[in-house]
A protein has these predicted regions:
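YjeF_N-associated NAD(P)HX repair module
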Residues: 1-17, 23, 120-230
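An N-terminal, well-structured beta->alpha segment
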Residues: 1-54
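Nucleotide and nucleotide-moiety/phosphate-recognizing core
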Residues: 36-129, 133-164
Length: 230
């Protein structure tokens, strides 16, 4: 008996992007739906306390910035560390309007990054997403920030970690981890459909629990790389 495909299965990043394209062309607010789902999981993982959001370039960072804005509007103390010179403009503007302080990572030394982590109940990893086409390994400022936070999240009573779509540093399709400088997530909030890299390879252990936010993708023409219950 052929098992029907499920959006919880692990799909290739190219198939996800292809399924997103017609919705984006039609003006669908995929990022807002994704951000609302991310914020919902953040509340569940850390109902109170400060939130530290790590933001890189691209739409992954945009999702994280919009979620940061939503949490800040609810009265949460939210701080953003920007690891890239350019971040999602609309997301950054909305976060700033909500009172979120955005700091460039190169304005913070390792001790300052670690101190922000220790002061937080939750760290959100929004550095890299499925748009990464080269090696998933973190580099430069992103790698330095994550390295500074690793002992913080590993400590007793350290902050919870929520990854946005896929933990930064994990290969989207193969789950490869070419550099161990990866924040291990307690929960990965993935959008549209499961990513194969969350279900296989070293990435599986780093993803934690996978929470799927359905944004209405049509994946009927795509074949999963990994079955969720395999």
């Amino acid at each position: 008996v052929t098992r029907p495909a499920s959006i919880a299965d692990g799909y290739a990043a190219d198939d996800i992007r292809a399924a997103e394209a017609p919705l984006l062309a039609a003006g669908a607010q995929l990022m807002r739906v994704a951000a609302a789902g991310l914020a919902r999981v953040c509340r569940a993982e850390a109902p109170e306390g400060a939130v530290l959001v790590l933001v890189g370039t691209g739409n992954n960072g945009g999702d994280a910035l919009l979620a940061a804005a939503e949490l800040a509007r609810e009265g949460r103390a939210v701080r953003v560390i920007r690891t890239a010179s350019r971040i999602h403009e609309d997301g950054a503007a909305e976060a700033a309007d909500a009172g979120v302080r955005v700091t460039a990572s190169d304005d913070l030394d390792d001790d300052a990054v670690a101190a922000l982590g220790r002061a937080s109940a939750l760290v959100v990893d929004g550095i890299l997403g499925i748009g990464t086409t080269a090696s998933p390994a973190l580099r430069g400022e992103a790698r330095r920030v994550v390295a500074a936070l690793l002992p913080v999240v590993a400590a007793d009573h350290g902050p919870r970690v929520v990854a946005c779509d896929i933990p930064s540093g994990v290969g989207c399709d193969d789950g490869a981890v070419p550099d161990p400088t990866v924040l291990p997530a307690d929960v990965t909030v993935t959008f549209g459909a499961g990513k194969a890299g969350l279900l296989r390879g070293p990435g599986r252990a780093l993803a934690g629990r996978v929470a799927l936010v359905d944004v209405g993708l049509d994946l009927s023409g795509a074949t999963p790389l990994v079955l969720a219950d395999a």
